[in-house]
Amino acid sequence: MTTLHRPSRRGHWALATLGGVIGVLGAVLLTGGVWLAALGGSWYYAPAGVALLIAGVLLFRGRNAGAWWFAAVVAATLPWTWWESGSDYWRWVPRLGLIVGLAFVLALLLPKLERPVSRAVSRSVAGVLAAVFVVAFALAFVPFGGTEADGALAHAAGMAAGLVKRSASAAPAASDGQPGNAPADDDWAAYGRSQAGQRYSPLQQINRDNVAQLKQAWVFHTGDLPSKRWGAETTPLKVGDSLYLCTARNQVIALDAASGKERWRYDPKVKDEAIPYTAACRGVSYYQVPVAANDAAAAVAAEGAPLCRTRIIEGTLDGRLIALDARSGKPCTDFGNNGQVDITVGMGQTPPGYVSINSPPAIVRGVVVTGHQVLDGQKRYEPSGVIEGFDAVTGQLRWAWDMTHPDWNGAPPPGQTWTRGTPNMWTTAAADEQLGYVYLPMGNSTADYWSSSRTPQENRYATSLVALDVTTGKPVWNFQTTHIDAWDYDLGSQPSLIDFPKDGVNVPAVLLPSKQGELYVLDRRTGKPLVGVEERAVPGGGVEPQMRAKTQPFSLYHTLRKPDLTERDMWGMTPIDQLVCRIQFRKASYKGIYTPPEADRHSIEYPGYNGGSDWGSVSVDPQRGVIVANYNDMPNYNLLVPRAKADKLGWAPRDEARGDAGGAEGAGDPQAGTPYAINVNAGWRLPFTKLLCKQPPYGGIRAIDLASGKTLWDRPFGSARGNGPFGIRSGLPIEIGTPNNGGSVVTASGLIFIAAATDDLIRAIDLSTGKELWHAKLPAGGQANPMVYAYNGREYLVIMAGGHHFMETPAGDAVVAYALPQQAP
């Protein structure tokens, strides 16, 4: 007769609890698995759920067969995981992590079964599984999904650098002595260092050999303490002995370049009601009044008004341009109305928060060229996206470009306004002083996700790079990156002006990144592509099938975009949330990039509206011939909501008592005046775990050969320190590749400096290999572009640590500078 083992009460309850957990897991996988299979998805989950349910019931009763059923699930899951995932580490995590963890617990409880397994066997099995866990955890610290530096490609980049070095300059030479056009080596005189927008510094005191010695040199707190809705995103300027920056609410501050101490401050008194969905001031502009203009202004100066020989021009969140004396911070009274110009004049009704300048204006040939942000998603006919050009000395309107009224060149005729709802330019322009052109990265018409009511002029210029002649205010050419945009794929990146090697000569070019991840190279004189652009067929349908373009432009030069999503790309912390994401994927409309939005089911937008490349743009090393691009790799999960339902939900425009959402752009936006509101799940996150449905990495950084467009290296960018399930910051230095906002700086010494990721670090990266050489912890999120300058023979790296509401990084008000110790060689 066989004697059955009766486990202790504690052992019985432990085994029963484990059986219950496994049984519940099985029931969930069975239910969801049947649903997924019915949708045409994977058949793994349903049979795995059956086996786990049986295993759970048997283990609850203490039966040995339960262990065998569970072992069968493990044995079947291993080859299935390899078939779906190959050697991709992050794909293994949700498929095997929980299963192996439960197997480890079961191994420890084997002696408690009805027919007990020996403790030696139990410990051996548990030991093997524990070793698997240790190895798997260690592998998490190895970056996956990248491309290592290749010697052949590096050689090709060196050849390109030789060609670029022979050119006079990789940026257009200045003709008027403006620091923003040709900054001194020690300076950072415009948002992208120069108006060419390359984000390249010729300094090389800090290099690969000593960068690990960087220490905090000084920190300055602006005192404009942010709430969850604010994130300054500012990149300071440095000209001469001073830094110039703006805070989240547009206070302008000058700092001593050596000590970081405040020289002066100007507060334009921007009210909180003027803040759109986030308070961002990405920078200010610097202008040096030419001598001839000084002479013309002498009479004004004699009457006691400040001359403002050098001036800081700032755009504010409430739609003003302000000119300040760079030395004293006092308003330039010869500019507009006592130092201010209201850009909303001529726009008609402009509720607070609807018209905001959040990026520094370009100044070309004495003309301040400004666009503005129009609050997204509220109405079809919001204020105009008109581009305005003002005299940099007097503030007088030189011209205005309203795309639907090309015959208007100044203020609108009496009783009329600039056309409402037209595409706007909310980001930073680039400028060529020699050509007299300003390059405008245009956004979309208001109501991003409904296109039927747009005019032909809107459809021509929306989501385009427009070259405008600053003398006339007229467009010279435009290049469109999305035809009839219904995805919020506006151009967020500042273009970069470069010399591009073609047919043995260097051609004046503009490098244009897009949110879709495309990099276009255009002749900046004509707008013609210097490397092929192919019109490819894209999906049709959606709620406006008659409006969808049959083709879209794809660059043959380079793309940051990854392959289309598949069900296998769905992720999670466990098989359960991964299963939920798989079901959502199968339920949604997805036909690849440019899948049209729908109202009867969700649609997947991939890449999402945060890029690809967004407002941080790219940096360019013109000497080595290398482009550095950090990028996002996340989808959005979108749904058009019929008007009647949106009204019941209370989705109304902000000025109609909608209130302040303070959340992600597009999340419950009413789009009044169209048949549909829009609900965007930006990043496609599950509400409970707050994890993204797509597998990592979610962001990367890449070096690209300028001449050929080939990838030199590509790595996940950003660690999991600031991320984790349920919104808990894990603190783990795992280079998972996180979402990122903000750009990089490249120096002549071969270093990349960048913050941008969600882990609140600023990094130094070797340009030649992509390897991290140094990092420092910031006091808040580093969602801003850094800058580099030198003063009194010492090189400094500066970053604004202000945080970001959508990225959910800590908010702050710190401007932090790093430098080598004084005694360092």
List each language-model region with its residue ranges.
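Hydrophobic or amphipathic alpha-helical targeting/insertion segments
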Residues: G101-L109, V125-F133, A138-F141, T147, ...
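Repeat-blade elements of multi-bladed beta-propeller folds
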Residues: W188-G192, W230-R249, P276-R320, G353-K379, ...
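Short, solvent-exposed loop/turn elements at domain surfaces
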Residues: A189, S194-P202, D224-R229, I253, ...
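Long, low-complexity segments enriched in small/aliphatic residues
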Residues: A430, Q552, L556-M634, A644-K645, ...
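Blade/loop signatures of beta-propeller domains
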Residues: A149-A217, M403-W408, M573-A599, G673-T674, ...
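Topology signature of small-to-medium multi-pass alpha-helical membrane proteins
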Residues: T2-G158
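Extracytoplasmic/lumenal domain signature
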Residues: N210-G223, V252-A274, Q288-N294, L321-P352, ...
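Asp/Glu-centered strand-loop micro-motifs enriched in Gly/Pro and often flanked by an aromatic residue
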Residues: Q195, S201-V211, Q216-Y244, K269-K271, ...
